[in-house]
Amino acid sequence: MTAHAVRDLEEIVDWIARHDGPDRAQHVLGRIRAAVDALKRLPERGPHPAELIALGIREYRETFFKPYRIVYHVDGARVFISLIADGRRDMQSLLARRLLAG
């Protein structure tokens, strides 16, 4: 997981803990971790984010624990998680800032 993705996950868990309680936050954390762990078995299974396909970018893929989107890329046998975000956010802007700006 990149430092940005770790921070994304911490912010998600903190927000849920404040608004929905620590038990719900731990549940979401466990489900997101399970989705990430599943990538070890079949990393190429995730679709390419539509927002990036529209720009001709097919380097990244995504998996979900709805409403959360986990954006990653595969380099050989390694999977790099680049972004974890609530899919209800403005993903076009978020992906552009995070992935395209460097």
Mark where each language-model region is.
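PIN-domain endoribonuclease scaffold, especially VapC-family toxins
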Residues: 1, 27-40, 60-64
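Basic/aromatic recognition patch in beta-strand/loop cores that engages polyanionic ligands
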Residues: 42, 47-78
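Enriched for short, Lys/Arg-rich terminal
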Residues: 65-102
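Generic structural signal for secondary-structure transition and capping sites
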Residues: 21, 37, 41-44, 68, ...
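Arg/Lys-rich, positively charged N-terminal/basic patches that mediate binding to nucleic acids
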Residues: 1-31
